[in-house]
Amino acid sequence: MKKRFLAVLLLAALLTLPGCGGEKQTAFQVGDKVETYWFQFTVDQVKTTDRWMDYQPQEGDRLAVCYLTLESTFSEAVPMNWADFVLVWGGGEADGSYPIEYQGQEQLPDEYDLVKGEERTGCLVFEVPQGVTQAKLVFQELFNEGDSDSVYTEGDTYTVDVDLPA
């Protein structure tokens, strides 16, 4: 529930605030290479399932598994974590979710560094309502203000349209 609430806040921010790079918001499809400030990523494939290892979704939900390839293009290691990507659907206040916690297998860790020149593949697993058939995987650039860990400037927002098979 906490992750879903945070996703709602991110969704509200994404829908109301323009990025610092102008009004640019770039939309992509599964298989397209998305180039951000720090790295490139591709959503290679999306599947749905009723269970991921030992994790079962709430009643009425299922899991969307987004397989990604990330490639660092930045001159330094880029810290990554579970909150970097969010899956959003519909237009309501509760229509979004952060990935579930790391369960193992090919899932991307909750925290890791994307080292200069590194290519990493893995998946993010999201809990979504059963009836959702289309969504967007969202990444938004956030730049630290000086030494602050809590003050950010928003950069560009990237969305990848995904179909969630029944």
Regions found by a protein language model. Give the residues of each.
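Short, solvent-exposed beta-strand/turn "edge" segments of beta-rich domains on protein surfaces
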Residues: 47-65, 76-77, 112-115
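Hydrophobic core residues within well-ordered beta-strands of beta-rich domains
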Residues: 39, 64-66, 120
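Bacterial signal peptide processing site
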Residues: 21-23
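Low-complexity, acidic Ser/Thr/Pro/Gly-rich terminal tails and inter-domain linkers that flank the onset
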Residues: 28-60
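The feature marks short-to-medium sequence segments in extracytoplasmic or secretory-pathway proteins
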Residues: 71-120, 145-150, 161-165
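Bacterial N-terminal signal peptides that target proteins for export
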Residues: 1-7
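C-terminal motif of bacterial Sec signal peptides marking the signal peptidase cleavage site
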Residues: 15-19
